[in-house]
Amino acid sequence: GERGLLIGRHDKRGRTLWSLPKGHIEVGETPEAAALREVEEETGIVSKITRSLGVIDFWFMADGKRIHKTVHHFLFSEVSGDLAPQISEVDVVDWFPLDEIATRLAYPDERKLIARSGDLRKP
């Protein structure tokens, strides 16, 4: 069946925290172009965007300053590539059945995003 791609990082206790591939937009880059680049940089998979999954918008504190962050999420389909962690920040990458994605995700905001996204099999 259809699968979803997650990246994993090991925490201090050795547990794997699974999350959606993500990264920062570079100067002059669209959110879509950044997403395609980050997926390939983190996982080795070349993909194409099939639809937007929405935006997570939030504030957090860092070094005593309030930081505003906007995260764009997209649904992809795989084009080519060999699945393997490509950068040091990613410890492991793996495919999961689509109906397991939400429960595998370590972060509540990503779980909510997937829950709101409807049928991931539909472009």
Stretch-by-stretch model annotation:
Residues G1-L20:
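N-terminal strand-loop-strand
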Residues R9, G44, A115-R116:
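A ubiquitous, low-specificity "background" feature that marks scattered single residues
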Residues K112-L120:
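A small-molecule sensor/coupling module
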Residues P123:
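Catalytic cores of nucleic-acid ligases and guanylyltransferases
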Residues I25-K112:
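Unchanged
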